[in-house]
Amino acid sequence: MSDQPAADAALSGLRLNLRILSVVMFNFASYLTIGLPLAVLPGYVHDVMGYSAFWAGLVISLQYFSTLLSRPHAGRYADLWGPKKVVVAGLAGTLICGLCYALAAFSSAVPLLSLLLLCLGRLVLGVGQSFAGTGASLWGVGVVGSAHIGRVISWNGICTYGAMAIGAPLGVVIYQRGGLLLLAAAICLISLTAMLLALPRPQVKSSKGKPLPFRAVLGRVWGYGVLLAMGSVGFGVIATFITLFYQARGWDGAAFALTLFSVAFVGTRLLFPNAITRFGGLKVALVCFAVEAAGLFLVWGAEAAWLVRVGALLTGAGFSLVFPAIGVVAVSRVPPQNQGSALATYTTFMDLALGLTGPLAGLIIAHYGVPVIYLLSGMLVCVAMVGALWLGRRAVGEK
């Protein structure tokens, strides 16, 4: 995206943040529609509809696969149409998802049809999320300039998990009051409101530099994307299976654990806004991976609900800065006119990890129980620590 005039580069921190928030709030709306059913759908598919943990995980993960496949198209259409139109298209996708949920509620007497409608809704939601999320990031960079891309990434993430922190418990309350149908109505209302707010906003100009082909961008960022993918598994198992973990233990309060994860995520970004600039992305990522792994191991071995909550808190705090810390390094590997493409390519690794986590973890649960997925996820994050060390040493060697 093109930089704004020099005067904009001197924006005060508050004004800069407000300008970013005025755009990434649309990603907040998109993720609110994701967070609302997050603590409801796994149990609904498993307990109400009677399907296995594999299908419960697959319903959630279909969204991530859809996001993965549509992310490159979101970046391409952002270049063709501008990020604003891509954001509006993404919000239209979340609206359609809400309608699919409503139809699934009406079809509850036919479980297979209801399941297919839920799956269709999750697929459309994935497209909507990739368009809204990618478009909001590029829109934010266009508003404040590419010099502030790290800040845009951080605020976009705060909106993402802030929406989930609000959405998970709110979705449980809505579901308890009116079932899946009322939850679907809430999703439709949020999506429509966000679309109406986005439409009057001005467009931003796209960069006129010659973009690198996708293969070239991928070649420069894939190593950092792999680290992101391994770190994202911890988020995936918390978000998708913490409800089933609580049920297996006979505990209540899974939605609160999700909220703690999201609160820790947002709080860490607010408490350490300059950590990446001060210490460097890979050094920050190392510390984050260590904290995330500790949280996952704690959940695995928890014998009391409060230990799971502490583990979720640590996992959220650790995962918080993983995306921007590694992302800033990844984006710096390409010319400025290709930063949007690099960011989208980098993000697809998280989409892939989250898409694989649901069904694979569901299969593992079917054979070995729920707790073991947190042990394996913690071990994978430890591998990411080794990878970050290696990339850091390679970067020093290149200098």
Regions found by a protein language model. Give the residues of each.
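Helix-loop boundary and gating motifs at the non-cytosolic
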Residues: 18-60, 64, 236-245, 249
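Hydrophobic core of transmembrane alpha-helices in multi-pass small-molecule transporters
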Residues: 28, 113-131, 308-321
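Residue-level signature of mid-helix packing/kink "hotspots" within the transmembrane helices
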Residues: 64-72, 164-165, 265-270, 354-355
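Conserved MFS/SLC helix-loop-helix module at the cytosolic interface between two early adjacent transmembrane helices
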Residues: 69-107
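Helix-to-loop junctions at the C-terminal end of transmembrane segments
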Residues: 70-82, 175, 268-281, 365-366
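C-terminal ends and interior cores of transmembrane alpha-helices
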Residues: 92-111, 291-303
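Cytoplasmic helix-loop-helix junction between adjacent transmembrane helices
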Residues: 121-159
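C-terminal membrane-cytosol helix-exit motif in multi-pass small-molecule transporters
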Residues: 188-206, 387-392
